[in-house]
């Protein structure tokens, strides 16, 4: 989720989780036929800030002998990036590795020293790992049991949702409850990344309702900086804050904000600019694994899914025009 996705799903004690397991997913399945646009907003709700920073958060340890020696920066092999759309900036190697690394524990260890040295991109991507793996790592046994229960329901999207959750389980398998991956940690890492200069992290904080500054001038300036950057991760991080939650705000981008279509347009623009919106990417996986919002076509990417299920035919032209406007301006350095 946060997203590249952000999310604010609450962590529950394992006992409570286990006791309500089947009924919870039964309700989710029953609601699967409701308006997808509203469900998309729910799945992408930004992370909530903690009431106060916890000084004794348990961070994933730098070295765990039982989990292998993965502390070096070269521990995750470089993976060839997918081709970006024409005119879009190529994704950084760290972003490509986040999307494609089969072991996110090893990936997190490989970029830890760079994050500790204050590199904004490394801190931001650590927050993405923590967000992606938080639900699994808080209770791996219960998570696996839920996955089996969902698959056993044999509903139209059961197989897709079970598959997405299995991808999360596989990639996050070496994280454990004692690592303390929760959404307080995600929020604190994103504050750290934003203060270090990460535009996607800064955008995610604005989308969560906890911007670095609370003035309308700051908000308008940040939206403008994201637009000029043409950074797909910044677009994706900002998208939840550009939907109906921004209705009525004054800014130079008001025509590109304040409606349900606006949120989708920002995310679709991120896809065009090079965000991994493929069927197995983190965006589609998080929608499906965390929110039960899954395509029945296992090969369908985010754009195909949205146009099929979330945008009425008469609204497609409006969204197309918004996306064109969002990606049309020339990229400028930040």
List each model region and its residues:
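Extracytoplasmic intrinsically disordered, low-complexity "stalk/linker" and propeptide segments
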Residues: 72-117, 123, 137
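Short helix-capping/linker turns of helical repeat alpha-solenoids
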Residues: 116-123, 130-133, 137, 145-178, ...
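N-terminal, positively charged topogenic segments adjacent to a membrane insertion site
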Residues: 1-22
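Hydrophobic membrane-insertion alpha-helices, especially the h-region
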Residues: 25-42
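Primarily a tetratricopeptide repeat
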Residues: 109, 188, 221, 265, ...
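Juxtamembrane proline-rich low-complexity "stalk" or linker regions positioned immediately after a signal peptide
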Residues: 9-14, 47-89
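Mature extracytoplasmic/lumenal regions of exported proteins
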Residues: 244-298
């Amino acid at each position: 989720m946060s997203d590249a996705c952000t999310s604010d799903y609450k962590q529950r004690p394992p006992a409570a989780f286990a006791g309500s397991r089947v009924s919870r997913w039964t309700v989710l399945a029953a609601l699967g036929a409701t308006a997808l646009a509203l469900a998309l907003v729910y799945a992408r709700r930004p992370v909530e800030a903690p009431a106060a920073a916890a000084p004794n958060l348990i961070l994933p340890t730098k070295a765990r002998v039982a989990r292998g020696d993965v502390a070096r920066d070269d521990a995750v092999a470089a993976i060839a990036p997918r081709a970006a759309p024409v005119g879009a900036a190529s994704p950084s190697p760290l972003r490509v590795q986040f999307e494609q690394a089969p072991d996110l524990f090893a990936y997190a260890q490989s970029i830890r020293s760079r994050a500790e040295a204050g590199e904004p991109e490394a801190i931001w991507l650590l927050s993405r790992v923590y967000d992606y793996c938080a639900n699994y790592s808080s209770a791996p046994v219960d998570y696996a049991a839920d996955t089996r229960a969902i698959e056993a329901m044999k509903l139209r999207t059961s197989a897709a949702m079970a598959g997405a959750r299995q991808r999360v389980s596989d990639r996050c398998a070496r994280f454990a409850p004692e690592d303390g991956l929760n959404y307080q940690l995600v929020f604190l890492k994103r504050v750290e990344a934003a203060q270090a200069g990460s535009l996607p992290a800064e955008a995610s904080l604005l989308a969560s309702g906890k911007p670095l500054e609370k003035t309308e001038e700051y908000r308008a300036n940040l939206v403008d900086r994201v637009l000029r950057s043409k950074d797909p991760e910044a677009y994706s991080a900002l998208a939840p804050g550009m939907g109906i939650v921004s209705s009525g705000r004054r800014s130079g981008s008001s025509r590109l904000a304040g409606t349900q279509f606006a949120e989708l347009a920002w995310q679709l623009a991120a896809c065009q600019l090079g965000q991994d919106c493929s069927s197995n990417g983190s965006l589609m996986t998080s929608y499906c694994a965390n929110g039960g919002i899954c395509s029945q076509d296992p090969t369908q990417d985010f754009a195909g899914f949205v146009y099929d299920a979330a945008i009425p035919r008469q609204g497609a032209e409006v969204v197309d025009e918004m996306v064109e406007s969002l990606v049309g301006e020339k990229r400028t350095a930040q």
